[in-house]
A protein has these predicted regions:
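Extracellular and secretory-pathway beta-repeat/beta-biased strand scaffolds
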Residues: 2-243
C-alpha cells in the first residue's frame, strides 16, 4: 500500500479556501473518474419528479422543500454530462434559503455546469453535496455557487438523514456539516478535474481527495469575494437562462 493510501485511510483531508485559486496538484490517492455518459438526474422520491424540468440541455431543479434557511434535495442519481447545465434553485413557492443540501445515493458525476441560484438571475448560497461514494467533477465540469462543500458521509449517517426519499437536515446538522464533524465513508473519494467557482469558500472532506488527476486536467478551485459569474454560467451556445 502506498504512503498516500495509508494516509488517506488514517484521516480525512480537508480543503478550506476563503480566497484561493488552484490549478493543479494531488491530495490523497488517485481515484477513477466516471466515464462520459448521458445526463441522469433523478429525485429519490418519485413524488418530487416534477421538481426537475428540462429545456434545451438546461435542467432546472427546484428543492424538495425549504424549511427556514435550509433547502434540501434528495437524489437517487446526479450525473450531468458535458454540454448540459443544471440550475439548482435555493427557493420555492416564495420561500428562500441561503443553504442548499443535496443528498445523492449514487456517486455524483459532473461534466457539465452546475449553477446554484439564490434567485432567478443570481449565483449564490452555500451549497452542499453529500454522497457516501463521493463526487467527481470532470475536466469539462464546472460548479458555480456562493460556497461549495462536498463530503462523503458514512452510509449510516446518510441513511439516518434520509427518510422515505426525503432529506432530514436540522440546524444542528448544518453546524456539523460546516465544521466537518460527521463520520465519513472510508471508501469515499472526491476527484476534481474541472472548475469550482465561489465567492466565499470551497470545502472538500473525504478520506481521499484528488485535485488534478491527470497532467492535462484543468482543475481550478477559485474563491473571490468579488467573483463575476457572468462568463462562467453558460456553455458555448447553451445558455443557463439567467438573463
Amino acid at each position: 500500500m502506498s504512503t498516500y493510501r495509508k494516509l488517506a485511510k488514517k484521516q480525512a483531508l480537508r480543503l478550506s479556501m476563503a480566497i484561493v485559486t488552484m490549478t493543479s496538484g494531488v491530495m490523497g490517492w488517485m481515484a477513477t473518474v466516471h466515464a462520459d455518459g448521458v445526463t441522469n438526474i433523478q429525485k429519490a422520491d418519485s413524488a418530487n419528479a416534477g421538481t426537475i424540468t428540462t429545456t434545451n440541455n438546461v435542467w432546472t431543479v427546484a428543492p424538495d422543500k425549504v424549511e427556514g434557511d435550509i433547502a434540501t434535495n434528495a437524489f437517487s442519481k446526479f450525473t450531468l454530462n458535458q454540454n448540459n447545465i443544471a440550475n439548482l434553485l435555493l427557493y420555492k413557492n416564495g420561500q428562500n434559503a441561503n443553504k442548499l443540501v443535496n443528498m445523492v445515493n449514487d456517486r455524483i458525476d459532473i461534466r457539465g455546469t452546475v449553477n446554484a441560484l439564490k434567485n432567478a438571475t443570481t449565483i449564490g448560497g452555500d451549497v452542499y453535496f453529500l454522497s457516501p461514494s463521493g463526487m467527481a467533477v470532470g475536466r469539462t465540469g464546472v460548479i458555480n455557487a456562493g460556497s461549495i462543500t462536498a463530503l462523503t458521509p458514512s452510509a449510516d449517517w446518510f441513511d439516518k438523514h434520509l427518510d422515505n426519499g426525503q432529506a432530514k437536515i436540522s440546524a444542528s446538522d448544518m453546524d456539523a456539516l460546516k465544521a466537518g464533524a460527521i463520520p465519513l465513508n472510508a471508501d469515499g473519494s472526491i476527484v476534481i478535474d474541472g472548475r469550482l467557482n465561489t465567492q466565499s469558500g470551497i470545502h472538500l472532506r473525504a478520506p481521499a481527495i484528488t485535485v488534478g488527476s491527470a497532467p492535462d486536467a484543468a482543475a481550478a478551485l477559485q474563491s473571490k469575494a468579488d467573483l463575476d459569474f457572468t462568463d462562467l454560467v453558460n456553455i458555448g451556445s447553451v445558455s443557463a437562462g439567467l438573463g
